[in-house]
């Protein structure tokens, strides 16, 4: 009998439980000995710095590989499903914007620099985006210019779609290697959360968690509205009958499993089995379900939008609605890069924050806040993402059957 490898020991186990334990231990240490709690804050700072280091290369490699490996000439029957995926993700981001405007949230961060230069409306933001698009790719990676990174990744990905199979295999293997490094970093999340929570409570008091509770309320509120109101409306638009039997079936049989696995990729077999029982043809489900696990990211769009606007409010920035609408579009695009990576949506926050000229160190601290609330946030996000995959696929299948 072989012993488990070090990597399997490190990456295995229940991450949610370990993060929860780290959160509780950090809070207890801060209440018992605030001085020690401030000292262990270096663990959280190290974790956040690790996230900042991996985020640029992660976005570049995942987007490049995903576009380069996309099959040319996709089945036209998938187009209605893709439309629903894109529409659902954008509607989710827009819902997050509306709730964030209704319930603006500020966060307790370690630092609050006074030298911010917030953009003066949508015109300045568009100008910044255009100039960042043409940044030198190496400089974009070094400076974490995520807009430039995204532009180069998309451009190179399109150019490499007709590359040799060996090139595509290399890109896919490289993406998996980067994802493995990310998993190793994420495996230390319990220690990082322990340090972040301990330092936050010791420095700011337990009241800091009031802001986190409000933030979590906005996040979960947006997800509930999307899952029980907006997704059914989109399904009704497609099948023209009561959408709730199908919606509740998908939430119960796919969402619950995804909530505990916290992985859309791991939930693909569950969705495939459910799609088959719902009458979806295998040739459609075998493509649409894995594709949904990659690009259908309503929960991730909500997370990116809410946390980015919370970062803006924390820095005293008051976004106008036009800017927030642009954020919805950016969040929808960014969310597609969050698939298959633990905490992936959190790592894309710096990209969205760059729209408001929020420094990367502040964005990284917001990522840390995301990990503190991630015990619930990431589970709920995955449940929404994965259940929506099979929901929209089944809805399109039923609509096609009605036409036949």
UniProtKB/Swiss-Prot annotation:
Its localization reads: Cell inner membrane
Determine if Transport is one of this entry's keywords: yes
Topology versus the membrane, per the UniProt entry? Multi-pass membrane protein
Q: Which GO terms describe its molecular function?
A: neutral L-amino acid:sodium symporter activity
User: Which GO annotations describe the biological process of this protein?
Assistant: serine transport; threonine transport
Q: Where are the disulfide bridges?
A: none
- Which sequence ranges are marked TM in the entry? 12-32, 53-73, 81-101, 140-160, 177-197, 216-236, 287-307, 329-349, 356-376
UniProt KW Cell membrane keyword: yes
| Key words of the record | Amino-acid transport, Cell inner membrane, Cell membrane, Membrane, Symport, Transmembrane, Transmembrane helix, Transport
Q: What is its main location?
A: membrane
What reaction(s) does this enzyme catalyze? L-serine(in) + Na(+)(in) = L-serine(out) + Na(+)(out); L-threonine(in) + Na(+)(in) = L-threonine(out) + Na(+)(out)
The record's listing under InterPro entries reads: Na-dicarboxylate_symporter, Na:dicarbo_symporter_sf, Ser_Thr_transp_SstT
Q: Name one GO cellular component term.
A: plasma membrane
Report the function annotation for this chain. Answer: Involved in the import of serine and threonine into the cell, with the concomitant import of sodium (symport system).
What family is it from? Belongs to the dicarboxylate/amino acid:cation symporter (DAACS) (TC 2.A.23) family.
Name under which the protein is recorded? Serine/threonine transporter SstT
Please give the organism.
Actinobacillus pleuropneumoniae serotype 5b (strain L20)
Q: What is the lineage of its organism?
A: Bacteria, Pseudomonadati, Pseudomonadota, Gammaproteobacteria, Pasteurellales
